[in-house]
Amino acid sequence: MAIRKSQVYLSLANSYLIDSPQPSTLNYWYNLGSLLGLCLVIQIASGIFLAMHYSSHIDLAFASVEHIMRDVNYGYLIRYIHANGASFFFVCMYAHIGKAIYYGSYKSPRVLVWVIGVVIFIITMATAFLGYCWVYGQMSHWGATVITNLFSAIPFIGKDLVPFIWGSFSVSNPTIQRFFALHYLCPFILAALVIMHLMALHVHGSSNPLGISSNIDRLPFHGYFVFKDLVTVFVFLLIFSLFVFFSPNTLGHPDNYIPGNPLVTPASIVPEWYLLPFYAILRSIPDKLGGVIAMFAAILILLVLPVTDRSVVRGNTFKIISKTFFFLFLYNFILLGQLGQLHVEVPFIQLGQFATLNYFLYFIFIVPVVSTLENILFYIGRVHNN
C-alpha cells in the first residue's frame, strides 16, 4: 500500500487533496474555493509581518503604518499585498456565494456546508471592518465611530454597549488596541471554520453544474483538478500583481492617508467597497434600529435559501425563469453597491429603498414562487413526455 494511504496524517491529506473523487463536469466557477484558500494564506502571512512593525497605540498607529511604508524593507509591498488581498478576498467570496446560489449548492444534503459558509462570510466582514479601523486614518476613525454607534440602536442595552465596545467615551486608544487584537485573532478563527467547511463538504462531495447525481462519473482530485485549479491561480496572481504593483490605491479611499481627526468630519463617510451593498441597505431605512435590523437581516437571510427553494431540480442551469431572476438579483446587488457610495439625497434614497425591497423579495417571495412554478412545469413536461 502506498505511504500516502497507510500513514495516518498523509492518508487524511490524500482523502482530501489526491484521491478525493470529484464530478467530472465541474467548471471553472468551482475553482473559487481554492482561490479563497490562497487569499486566506496571503492575508495571514502578510498580516503577521505587518503586525511585527505595527503599534496599536492611538498616537502611534498612523505613524507606524507610515513607518512600514517608508522604512521597513519591502514594507510598502507587504501592506499593498494585504490591503489589495482583502479586496480580492471579497471578489472571490462574492463570486463563490453567487456560484453557490446559481448552482443550488445550498440544497440538501449540503445545508451544513452552506451554513458554515455564511458564518465564514460574516466573520470575514467583521475581520475586514476591524482591520480597516486600526490604520487610524480619517476614514478609519469615522468608519469605526459610525459602525460602532449602530449598536446604540439596540433597545435597553444599546446606550451602555457602545462605551463598552469603545472602552472609553469615544473611539480612542482602548478601541484601536482591542480592534487590533480581535483583527489578529479573527483570521485563525476563519482558518478553523474553513477546515469545518471542508469537512462538511467532504461528507457528500461537491455538487456539479448539472444539478444531478455524479456518483457514476467522478475523477480523482489530483492531477485533473489540481492543474485545473492552477490555471485560475496563475490568472488570479497575474491580476492581483497588476493591482499591487501598478495601481495599489485604486480600491482604497484617499481620506485614509490623512491622520484620524475626531474634530473634522469627512465630506462623506463610506466603508470599503466590499461592504457598500449592506451599507446601502442600512441607509435606506430611515429608522436607526430598522436600518440595523435590515443590514444584519440582509446577511442572515442567506440561511433561508435551503428552505425557500422548493425546486426538485438543483441549480439554475436548465431553468430559464430562475436564471432570469438570478441575473436581475445580481444586477440589483451591484446597484446597491453603487448606491452605498453616493450621497444620501434624492433620487438615491428612493432608489436605495427600491433596491433593498427587491433584495429581500428575491429570497422571501421570488425564489419560493418561481421554484414552485418550475416544479409544476417540470411535472407537466414529464407527464407529457410519458
Swiss-Prot record:
Pfam families: Cytochrom_B_C (PF00032), Cytochrome_B (PF00033). One of its GO terms (molecular function) is ubiquinol-cytochrome-c reductase activity. The keyword Membrane applies. Heme b b562 binds at residues 82, 183. It comes from the Eukaryota. It is a multi-pass membrane protein. GO terms for cellular component: mitochondrial inner membrane; respiratory chain complex III. Binds 2 heme b groups non-covalently. A ubiquinone binds at residue 202. Its cofactor is heme b. The chain crosses the membrane at residues 32-52, 76-98, 113-133, 179-199, 225-245, 289-309, 321-341, 348-368. One of its GO terms (biological process) is mitochondrial electron transport, ubiquinol to cytochrome c. Fungal cytochrome b-c1 complex contains 10 subunits; 3 respiratory subunits, 2 core proteins and 5 low-molecular weight proteins. Cytochrome b-c1 complex is a homodimer. Heme 1 (or BL or b562) is low-potential and absorbs at about 562 nm, and heme 2 (or BH or b566) is high-potential and absorbs at about 566 nm. Component of the ubiquinol-cytochrome c reductase complex (complex III or cytochrome b-c1 complex) that is part of the mitochondrial respiratory chain. The b-c1 complex mediates electron transfer from ubiquinol to cytochrome c. Contributes to the generation of a proton gradient across the mitochondrial membrane that is then used for ATP synthesis. This is Cytochrome b. It comes from Wickerhamomyces canadensis. The gene is COB.
